[in-house]
């Protein structure tokens, strides 16, 4: 089965579409560009499917390279047979290839290699053959006693032969494959306490679970506990299940050497095979858990980045703190800093009242409409102060509301070189207040400045393979930025470098060109940016918006290569570009439908998927896909934990989705947990089947433990 067929079968896709995507990737096209502008070639796969395909393509190509390297190595030893070539070529995983290569690998000195050096290989071969007329092992071994070679006795000779046979059995690919499968089906992971002290790992102090039923979060927690020296972990398998399988594979009844080989097989299992497979299975469990956790991290990150912006509103950002006070920044509707301050609401009643007065003055002076409060240290006290402040100012003509904003990564950003370049005139602490305000206004534009790992919506992210995690999360950020589109005249270099086809250098060049020549007035002008060649322009053009352009198409996701098609469609349906600008296209979908989609697509020279995208963009030039998502919950009052009672029905925002449940912000300082058993009335394997980060959900309070600061919630009982 060739590469294309293998990918198509594995992913359940049309081989023609898979082949087209492979060609597009090999030509240097980006995933966002392929997903958006080459739908006809891949059957409208989404960006997630395309990234999975790209990942599997890299794996299978790596597998093919390893196959060739292994065959070459064995061939150089003069041991490559047609059967071995066929076995290597049909191996589906790297583990299978390595099993086949194992007998031919250069080995460190082992008991078997030392026995071979003593000339005991012929004895091992004689006994392992188990011919019916074979001599008894003790008799066969007499001829191999040679004190000069270190074989002093018959027992020494037999021990050496047994070591050689044991290693040969251990290197058998078919045996390893069968036993690996047996451990995966029947093996158990056992975790025991390595200390008597209490810890966060107490759940795993006396824990046994089938390998097949282990959850990813359990594996990652156990691994961390083991790494910290708190847990002792092992894989167990009933020896009496494994040995019969081994005996059937290597023991030939009726031979005088049968019992000797049986004993060597048991030694192979205990000393070589099981310890090796235990490590393999542990590694495989970790890889699967890492893969699942990275996937969940990516799944959680996307809705966080895609939170609807609160556009055009003057916003006050509060970065709470105790010793250093509460840092304050007021930004206008475009995110430009208007004012900054530091207040001390936690120092006492007098200072709190002074803080309220100072903030009320800022609200009145700048017409603040929203307050964004960071959720870190002293957030609770700051929120209570903000509610008092809002009550006071809203008694007049103001209509101020607030929202708790995740400040994950804000301190890292505020101390970064990027923040220093953006706000050289402001103290590090005030920069984080600006970032918090902007996170409410446009979460995506602000969060792209931060390493995705610092945004804090994953489990055990520091334990995962960082390269794999970075690739997955950067892919999510890239997909989100390109799905939304970027205003080329206001975007920061951090945002621009996430646009398909651009990088750090070309993003800075775009900003430099903008500063030297003024705002871009057309997409065509982008071609003048230094080091931004034709390929980069092709990839990025459709994702960059130019609101100042005289052509309305430059402020849509219609790619310049489809401008002629868009104009032809307007002609075909009796419309003009002026109608697009004036929002007079309400009947466009009906006119296209009446004309016939296939016929219209054929006449304007595009496929039906592209036709539909053009229609969608012409209807709403400059649209932001995030505006169609549930709006963030802005509050004017605060709930205390003591106010919560079982049975209360509340509305909240999903903050995190993990293997065992969902964390929901219900307006109390502590997020509540909806255990997986309380997420849905139907059986689900993972909460992400039902809910995503950022979703607004109804919940019922089940239990409140003020002492432990735990809130148990139910989604299914609220339905």
Name each model-derived stretch.
Residues 181-188, 318-322, 376-378, 404-412, ...:
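A glycine-rich phosphate-binding loop feature that marks nucleotide/adenosyl-phosphate handling sites
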Residues 3, 61-79, 89, 412, ...:
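Long, highly charged, low-complexity intrinsically disordered interaction regions
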Residues 49-52, 59, 63-317, 321-426, ...:
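Duplex nucleic acid-engaging cores and interfaces of nucleic-acid transaction enzymes
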Residues 73, 87, 98-101, 225-238, ...:
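Structured, non-catalytic alpha/beta "coupling" segments that mediate domain-domain communication
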Residues 37-39, 128, 238, 320, ...:
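Short, ordered loop/turn segments at secondary-structure junctions
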Residues 1-19, 26:
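Generic start-of-chain signal for non-secretory N-termini
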Residues 546-550, 554-719:
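Single-stranded RNA-binding regions, centering on S1/OB-family and related RNA-binding modules
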């Amino acid at each position: 089965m060739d590469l294309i067929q293998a990918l198509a079968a594995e992913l359940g896709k049309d081989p023609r579409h898979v082949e087209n995507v492979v060609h597009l990737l090999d030509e240097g096209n980006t995933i966002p560009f392929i997903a958006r502008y080459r739908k006809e070639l891949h059957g409208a796969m989404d960006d997630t499917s395309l990234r999975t395909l790209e990942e599997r393509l890299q794996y299978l190509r790596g597998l093919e390279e390893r196959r060739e390297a292994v065959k070459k190595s064995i061939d150089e030893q003069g041991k490559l047979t047609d059967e071995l070539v066929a076995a290597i070529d049909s191996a589906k995983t790297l583990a299978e290839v390595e099993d086949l290569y194992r007998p031919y690998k250069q080995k460190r000195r082992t008991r078997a290699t030392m026995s071979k050096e003593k000339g005991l290989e012929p004895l091992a071969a004689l006994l392992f053959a188990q011919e019916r007329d074979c001599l008894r092992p003790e008799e066969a071994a007499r001829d191999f006693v040679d004190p000069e070679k270190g074989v002093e006795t018959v027992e020494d000779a037999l021990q050496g032969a047994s070591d050689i046979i044991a290693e040969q059995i251990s290197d058998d690919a078919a045996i390893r494959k069968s036993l690996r499968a047996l451990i995966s089906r029947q093996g158990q992971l056992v975790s025991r306490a390595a200390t008597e002290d209490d810890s966060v790992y107490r759940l795993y102090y006396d824990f046994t679970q089938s390998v097949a039923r282990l959850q990813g979060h359990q594996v990652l927690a156990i691994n961390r506990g083991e790494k910290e020296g708190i847990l002792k972990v092992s894989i167990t398998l009933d020896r009496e299940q494994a040995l019969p399988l081994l005996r059937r594979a290597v023991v030939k009844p009726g031979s005088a050497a049968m019992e000797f080989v049986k004993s060597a097989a048991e030694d192979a299992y205990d000393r070589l095979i099981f310890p090796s497979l235990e490590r393999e299975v542990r590694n495989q469990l970790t890889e699967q858990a890492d893969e699942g956790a990275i996937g969940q991290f990516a799944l959680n990150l996307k809705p966080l980045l895609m939170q609807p912006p609160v556009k055009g509103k003057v916003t006050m950002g509060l970065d709470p703190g105790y010793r250093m006070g509460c840092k304050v920044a007021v930004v206008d509707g475009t995110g430009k800093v208007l004012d900054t301050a530091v207040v001390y609401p936690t120092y006492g009643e007098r200072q709190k009242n002074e803080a309220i007065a100072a903030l009320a003055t800022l609200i009145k002076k700048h017409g603040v409409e929203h307050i964004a409060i960071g959720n870190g240290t002293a957030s609770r006290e700051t929120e209570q102060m903000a509610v008092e402040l809002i009550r006071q100012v809203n008694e007049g003509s103001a209509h101020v509301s607030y929202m708790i904003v995740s400040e994950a990564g804000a301190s890292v950003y505020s101390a970064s070189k990027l923040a220093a370049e953006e706000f050289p005139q402001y103290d590090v602490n005030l920069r984080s207040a600006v970032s918090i305000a902007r996170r409410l206004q446009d979460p995506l534009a602000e969060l792209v400045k931060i390493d995705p790992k610092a945004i804090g919506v994953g489990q055990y992210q520091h334990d995962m393979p960082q390269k794999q995690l970075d690739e997955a999360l950067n892919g999510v950020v890239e997909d989100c930025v390109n799905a939304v589109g970027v205003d080329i005249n206001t975007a920061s270099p951090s945002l621009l470098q996430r646009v398909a086809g651009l990088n750090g250098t070309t993003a800075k060049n775009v900003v430099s060109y903008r500063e030297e020549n003024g705002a871009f007035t057309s997409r065509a002008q982008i071609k003048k940016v230094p080091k931004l060649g034709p390929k980069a322009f092709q990839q990025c053009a459709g994702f960059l918006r130019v609101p100042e352009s005289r052509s309305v198409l430059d402020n849509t996701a219609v790619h310049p290569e489809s401008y002629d098609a868009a104009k032809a469609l307007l002609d075909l349906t009796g419309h003009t570009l002026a109608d697009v600008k004036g929002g007079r296209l309400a009947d466009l979908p009906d006119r296209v439908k009446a004309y016939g989609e296939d016929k219209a697509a054929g006449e304007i020279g595009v496929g039906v998927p592209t036709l539909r995208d053009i229609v969608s963009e012409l209807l709403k030039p400059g649209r932001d896909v995030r505006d169609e998502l549930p709006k963030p919950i802005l509050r004017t009052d605060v709930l205390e934990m003591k106010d919560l009672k079982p049975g209360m029905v509340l509305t909240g925002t999903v903050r995190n989705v993990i293997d065992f449940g969902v964390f929901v912000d219900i307006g109390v300082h502590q997020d509540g947990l909806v255990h997986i058993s309380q997420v849905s009335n139907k059986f689900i394997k993972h909460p992400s089947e039902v809910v995503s980060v950022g979703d607004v959900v109804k919940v019922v309070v089940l239990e409140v433990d003020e002492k432990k600061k735990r809130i148990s919630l139910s989604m299914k009982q609220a339905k």
